[in-house]
Regions:
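Metal/cofactor-centered catalytic core regions of large enzymes
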Residues: 1-160
Length: 160
């Protein structure tokens, strides 16, 4: 589905509180939060869908994925490309179906599974889990890629 504007530029950190699969609150700069809320309302009204739904999320697992141009040059292309990089945690929101209509991109996230970090600051912790460690043993060419994953994700500050 297409709509304009396709995205909202967020210049400062905005926090989203999610409860039981719904966006309960957004906090941050009042003007930016207002722009985000307006965008959600516009999209939900256009398609007759629930605006506060958080459908699903996934983190990137492709250490070779890079994006060498800027996110600002084409935000839609950026969000549909860079989500496979391990530095990116990608949420599907707005609508009760995959992938939803609005995505969130969380950069350099930490994600824990059963109390252990599977991602730490945007890097996968592959040696800490039997299944991922086994993948590195079965396909040793992956070990080098994960040891030095691509850092370029179109944001200009690519060092982590």
């Amino acid at each position: 589905k297409m709509y304009e504007p396709a995205s909202v530029q967020i210049e400062e950190v905005v926090f989203a509180e999610v409860q039981e699969g719904r966006i309960a609150d957004l906090t941050g700069n009042i003007n930016i939060v207002g722009d985000i809320r307006d965008h959600y309302q516009m999209v939900s009204k256009k398609f007759g869908i629930q605006d506060d739904n958080v459908h699903s999320f996934h983190a990137g697992i492709h250490p070779g994925c890079s994006y060498d141009t800027t996110a600002q040059a084409d935000p839609d292309r950026w969000s549909n490309t860079v989500f496979t990089n391990p530095r990116v945690l990608h949420f599907h929101t707005c609508g009760d179906y995959a992938p939803g209509e609005i995505c969130w991109m969380v950069i350099d996230h930490t994600l824990s599974v059963d109390g252990k970090n599977l991602w730490q600051d945007g890097r996968m912790c592959l040696d800490d889990f039997n299944a991922t460690r086994q993948c590195l043993e079965d396909w040793p060419e992956l070990k080098a890629m994960f040891a030095e994953p691509a850092q370029a994700i179109g944001l200009g500050n690519e060092a982590i």
